[in-house]
């Protein structure tokens, strides 16, 4: 990943270090600033986002030979469409996801759709669907499932997406309603637990 060599980027790096996260491949850019995300909570604790991201350090991430080596040495490679909204980070994401898949590293994809980061819905949908073949495990929200398949009936939408791509498992998070999972021939549904929502971020 990449953050700016600024107070925000250094604070993120320090926080990750304190939590014992390996930041050896996290780059500090002196050319681009750290992207900022502002979370807005409504009365029910649900959230929306605003981004300060024009040429953010994360969107300007380019691959280096050591990145591919780091992927090979990983047990799991996680990627998200947030890194695919702009180039060159888009090409970087696809290159590293493809490399992980080729080397047998477990790949996990969360579309994490933020439409306000994309030029338009068609571009977002196309890019997310292009990423699906690289994923062993996919995690989508109910809204993302409708966005990607056009199906408003949950189980049908999940079945359509699961059948279309070579994933091993599909997890559909449903907020307070729980989760639906498809893996092999199994379909597993679990209700959510009744809790007071504070912050869904």
What residue spans do the PLM features occupy?
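Structural recognition of alpha->loop->beta junctions
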Residues: 17-21, 122-147
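Structural alpha-helical scaffold elements that stabilize or flank donor/cofactor-binding regions
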Residues: 69-70, 130-131, 163
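Conserved phosphate-binding/catalytic region of the ribokinase-like
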Residues: 98-102, 151-201
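Conserved N-terminal subdomain of the carbohydrate kinase-like
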Residues: 2-79
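Active-site beta-loop-alpha junctions enriched in small/polar residues
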Residues: 54, 82, 112-116, 143, ...
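Hydrophobic beta-strand scaffold residues
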Residues: 23, 107-109
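Glycine-centered short loops/turns at secondary-structure junctions
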Residues: 20, 102-104
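Proline-centered loop/turn at the N-terminus of a beta-strand
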Residues: 106, 137, 168-169
């Amino acid at each position: 990943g990449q953050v700016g060599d600024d107070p925000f980027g250094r604070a993120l790096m320090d926080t990750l270090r304190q939590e014992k996260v390996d930041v050896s491949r996290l780059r500090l850019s002196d050319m681009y600033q750290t992207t900022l995300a502002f979370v807005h909570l409504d009365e029910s604790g649900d959230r929306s986002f605003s981004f300060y991201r024009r040429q953010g350090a994360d969107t300007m991430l380019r691959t280096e030979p050591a990145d591919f080596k780091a992927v090979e040495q990983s047990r799991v490679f996680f990627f998200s469409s947030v890194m695919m909204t702009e180039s060159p980070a888009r090409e970087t994401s696809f290159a590293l996801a493809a490399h992980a898949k080729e080397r047998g590293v477990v790949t996990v994809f969360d579309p994490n759709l933020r439409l306000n980061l994309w030029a338009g819905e068609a571009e977002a949908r196309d890019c997310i669907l292009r990423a699906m073949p690289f994923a062993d495990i996919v995690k989508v929200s109910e809204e993302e499932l409708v966005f990607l398949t056009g199906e408003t009936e949950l189980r049908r939408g999940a079945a359509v997406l699961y059948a279309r791509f070579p994933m091993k498992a599909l997890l559909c998070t449903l907020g307070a309603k729980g989760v639906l999972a498809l893996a092999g021939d199994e379909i597993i549904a679990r209700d959510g637990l009744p809790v007071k929502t504070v912050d869904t971020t």
